[in-house]
């Protein structure tokens, strides 16, 4: 049985943090065992943030894959962290990489990749990709399942 006494958000009413910096990513222990590493995927198809110049909303489909070592990111804390971007002004690239770096800092995974598939503003979709290095040998990495933007196509 996993000790959940250190978790402050799971099972509790928690207000959405005012900013990503104020959000707390909590972790739970993970026993990865022998053999190829497990890959954990989080998909956030309705991610939102704000343009830092105009204040207009930006929307993205975010896919996060990581190979945990000794810790998993607790999913409610991740949800609150992701939601905290709704009032955060930053460029697409900064948001995407910030998310990846925060998860790496919290969990210290064997490997992580993040894809931010941003919906067009001004007619240009922006896709942002970041990873910590080469994927672990033997890991099963399915396609992200996000089709390239096609417009009217």
Swiss-Prot record:
GO terms for molecular function: preQ1 synthase activity. GO terms for cellular component: cytoplasm. Gene3D superfamilies: 3.30.1130.10. Keywords: Cytoplasm, NADP, Oxidoreductase, Queuosine biosynthesis. It comes from the Bacteria. The active site is at residues 51, 58. Disulfide bonds: none annotated. The keyword Oxidoreductase applies. GO terms for biological process: queuosine biosynthetic process; tRNA modification. Pathway: tRNA modification; tRNA-queuosine biosynthesis. It is found in: Cytoplasm. It catalyses: 7-aminomethyl-7-carbaguanine + 2 NADP(+) = 7-cyano-7-deazaguanine + 2 NADPH + 3 H(+). Its EC number is 1.7.1.13. InterPro entries: GTP-CH-I_C/QueF (IPR043133), NADPH_dep_7-cyano-7-deazaG_red (IPR050084), QueF (IPR029500), QueF_type1 (IPR016856). Substrate binds at residues 73-75, 92-93. Belongs to the GTP cyclohydrolase I family. QueF type 1 subfamily. PANTHER family: NADPH-DEPENDENT 7-CYANO-7-DEAZAGUANINE REDUCTASE (PTHR34354:SF1). This is NADPH-dependent 7-cyano-7-deazaguanine reductase. It comes from Mesorhizobium japonicum (strain LMG 29417 / CECT 9101 / MAFF 303099). The lineage of its organism: Bacteria, Pseudomonadati, Pseudomonadota, Alphaproteobacteria, Hyphomicrobiales.
């Amino acid at each position: 049985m996993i000790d959940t006494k250190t978790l402050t958000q799971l099972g509790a009413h928690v207000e959405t943090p005012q900013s990503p910096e104020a959000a707390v990513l909590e972790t739970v222990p993970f026993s990865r065992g022998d053999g190829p590493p497990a890959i954990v995927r989080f998909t956030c198809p309705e991610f939102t943030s704000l343009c830092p110049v105009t204040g207009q909303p930006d929307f993205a489909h975010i896919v996060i894959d990581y190979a945990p070592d000794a810790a998993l990111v607790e999913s409610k804390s991740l949800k609150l962290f992701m939601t905290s971007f709704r009032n955060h002004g930053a460029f697409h690239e900064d948001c995407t990489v910030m998310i990846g770096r925060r998860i790496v800092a919290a969990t210290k995974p064997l490997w992580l990749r993040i894809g931010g598939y941003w919906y067009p503003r001004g007619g240009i979709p922006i896709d942002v990709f970041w990873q910590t290095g080469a994927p672990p040998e033997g890991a099963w990495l399915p396609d992200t399942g996000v089709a390239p933007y096609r417009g009217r196509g």
